Every structure is written in C-alpha cells, then in structure tokens.
Design a protein with these regions (language model features):
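Terminal low-complexity tails and localization/encapsulation signals of metabolic enzymes
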Residues: 1-33, 67, 71, 121-146
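Residue-level signal for inorganic ion chemistry
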Residues: 28, 65, 87, 109, ...
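Rossmann-like NAD(P) dinucleotide-binding subdomain of oxidoreductase/dehydrogenase enzymes
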Residues: 121-226
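Histidine- and aromatic-rich ligand-binding microenvironments
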Residues: 5-6, 21, 30, 34-44, ...
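Short connector loops/turns at beta-strand edges and beta->alpha or beta->beta junctions
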Residues: 25-27, 47, 163
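Alpha-helix N-cap/helix-start motif
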Residues: 15, 42, 80, 98, ...
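Glycine-rich loop-to-alpha-helix module at the N-terminal edge of alpha/beta enzyme cores
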Residues: 31-119
C-alpha cells in the first residue's frame, strides 16, 4: 500500500518521483511504498500549520485542550494493540515489546492531560515602589518532532501530547523505515477532535529534515537519533 503524508487532517500523496520502499525486516518482504516530502512541501506544511495554530489552537481554552487530550488518551489505550502490530510489521520487534512501547507513550499522554492546569504564570506584588510583576506562559507556534527508527511510536508520544497540551502546532517527520505507526497515532488525534492542521505528518529523508531545521517558522525541534 501507499503510505502518504497527513497534512491538515487529510492524507496527502507526494510526487511519484519521490518514494521509498518499506520492508518487514523479519521477512524481507516489501510492505509498502512511502511518499517522500520535498523541501517545498515541508515549507507549505509549516505555513499551513502556522495558519491553523493562529486561527484555532492558539486561541483554544484550557478546557478545549483538555477535552482533546483525554479523548486521545482513551483512543490510544483502545487501539494500542493495532498500533503495536504496525510497529512489529515494519520495525521487527516482537509484539509484546511493541505493546510495551505504546504503553510507555500512553503514560506520557496521561501526564500531558494535566498540563493545561499547570500552565500558570506568576505574580509578585510591590517588587518595587508601586510596581507589580506578573508572568504568563504562551505557546510557541509550530514545533517539529524528528523521530528515530528504534521507537517509532514511543518517541513521538514523548513530545507530541506535551506540545499540543501547551497549545502548539506540530509537524512530525518519522523514520522512513517504519512510518505507519505515526500515521495511525495521528489519525487518533483527528478522531479525538484536534483541529485540522494542528498535527501534521511529513515523511521524508534528509531533504525533509533539512527543510524543518532551517524553516524560520519552526520555533522548536525535538530530536532523538538512533
């Protein structure tokens, strides 16, 4: 099957000239064909993610964020066996290890459910004559997650729920060796009610990574190499 990008809540097929085979390492069988993003496509995705963030998630109340996070957590718990099967088929680890990986990611999603209530600023009264000081916490905007081959579900789940809980839009670039688990998890976010464009998945190689690293509208990057 064709493994596409997920952009603005919709599967998005890239150029036919930019693809890569995906294999089951246990059998050597080709299991899919992965679309690879060009630098131009990455730029378009970041721009659209920023627009979605400005129009929706940046303005979302803490209650709205929490509702999406709790619903995502429930969906992830219900579907973790399905996601584990995708990991096993493309990564090669045994199913029990794959389920353990998703469970570790689920723990972070559970933690993130409480973050909106922890995003408190500070206030200090009369720090100087007739001067009060206060601080507030604000989202950054578009952030990127570049995840490795060895934990295709757990590593993105370390970062994405926290970034979304804090009000950011996210662009994920999974490993091109085992991309399907990230697509499956991203679909759960949409089902949980996250606005389109707040979570995007772009598949690719060095060209896509370089485009994310150098884009001026990407305000933070989470990277784990392997």
């Amino acid at each position: 099957p064709r493994i596409t990008h997920l952009i603005g809540g919709t599967p998005w097929q890239g150029s036919a000239a930019r693809t890569s085979p995906v294999f089951n390492p246990a059998t050597g069988e080709q299991t899919g064909v992965l679309d690879l993003a060009s630098s131009e496509l990455v730029g378009e995705v970041v721009t659209s993610a920023k627009a979605a963030w400005e129009s929706s998630w940046q303005r979302a109340s803490l209650t709205q964020r929490t509702q999406a996070l709790f619903r995502f957590r429930e969906l992830l718990n219900e579907r973790k066996a399905e996601i584990a099967e995708l990991i096993t088929a493309e990564h090669g680890k045994v199913v029990s290890d794959a389920i353990g990986e998703v469970t570790r990611g689920l723990e972070v999603a559970e933690f993130a459910c409480g973050i909106p209530h922890l995003l408190k600023g500070g206030f200090s009264e009369n720090v100087s004559t007739k001067v009060d000081v206060y601080s507030i916490r604000q989202s950054l905007g578009v952030v990127a997650v570049i995840s490795p081959f060895n934990f295709p579900a757990m590593v993105p789940l370390w970062f994405v729920p926290v970034a979304i809980a804090c009000g950011n839009a996210v662009v994920i670039k999974p490993s091109e060796k085992d991309p399907s688990a990230v697509n499956a998890v991203a679909a759960l976010w949409k089902e949980a009610g996250l606005p389109d464009g707040i979570l995007n998945v772009v598949h690719g190689d060095k060209e896509a990574v370089d485009a994310l690293l150098t884009h001026p509208d990407v305000k933070a990057i989470s990277f784990v190499g392997s």
